């Protein structure tokens, strides 16, 4: 991915020199030409086409922000209405992720979401230990992590 992105920038800068016009519009045009050229050559360049990876990373950020906003409202409800019966507790989340960086990313995303904290990962890296501010919604929490965060982290890590 990095090789393709650097090549695209080199092509864009080369385009500026060839056209002898150093404007932002001309750079964008050169970048688009470079993008087309890199796409045509992506089978011989290492890694998958970098635009796909960038799209998946942007998708990960958007999904995380949505989950973050939802979790903030859930915690806000608990703070505003202390009469709500929440049951803090611990649970084990079973993950299918294999790469260490994916497990770390998922753990960080879970920890950054208000109301949940990752306590650790098992030695075999198949279980993540989580503390939730409301344990009564464990099934919903597990389903939310599985269908949104873990799914997109897996997509970002695909080759």
UniProtKB/Swiss-Prot annotation:
Query: Which residues are listed as membrane-spanning?
Result: 5-22, 27-45, 52-69, 100-122
GO cellular component terms, A-Z: plasma membrane
Question: Out of the domains of life, which is the source?
Answer: Bacteria
Q: Does the keyword tRNA processing apply?
A: no
Per UniProt, activity regulation is: Na(+) extrusion is completely inhibited by the H(+) conductor carbonyl cyanide m-chlorophenylhydrazone (CCCP).
Question: Which portions of this protein are annotated as coiled-coil regions?
Answer: none
Question: Is the Membrane keyword given for this protein?
Answer: yes
**What keywords are assigned to this protein?**
Antiport, Cell membrane, Hydrogen ion transport, Ion transport, Membrane, Sodium, Sodium transport, Transmembrane, Transmembrane helix, Transport
Subcellular localization, per the record?
Cell membrane
The annotated topology with respect to the bilayer is:
Multi-pass membrane protein
Main function: Mnh complex is a Na(+)Li(+)/H(+) antiporter involved in Na(+) and/or Li(+) excretion. Na(+)/H(+) antiport consumes a transmembrane electrical potential, and is thus inferred to be electrogenic. Does not transport K(+), Ca(2+) or Mg(2+).
Question: What is the protein name stated in its UniProt record?
Answer: Na(+)/H(+) antiporter subunit E1
Name the species this protein comes from.
Staphylococcus aureus
């Amino acid at each position: 991915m990095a090789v393709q992105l650097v090549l695209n920038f080199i092509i864009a800068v080369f385009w500026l020199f060839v056209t002898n016009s150093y404007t932002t519009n001309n750079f964008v045009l050169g970048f688009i030409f470079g993008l087309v050229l890199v796409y045509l050559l992506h089978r011989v360049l290492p890694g998958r086409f970098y635009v796909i990876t960038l799209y998946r990373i942007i998708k990960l950020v958007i999904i995380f922000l949505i989950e973050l906003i939802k979790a903030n409202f859930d915690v806000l409800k608990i703070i505003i209405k202390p009469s709500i019966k929440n049951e803090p507790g611990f649970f084990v989340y079973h993950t299918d992720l294999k790469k260490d960086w994916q497990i770390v990313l998922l753990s960080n995303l879970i920890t950054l979401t208000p109301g949940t904290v990752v306590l650790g990962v098992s030695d075999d890296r198949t279980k993540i230990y989580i503390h939730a501010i409301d344990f009564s919604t464990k099934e919903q929490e597990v389903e939310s992590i599985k269908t949104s965060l873990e799914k997109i982290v897996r997509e970002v890590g695909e080759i």
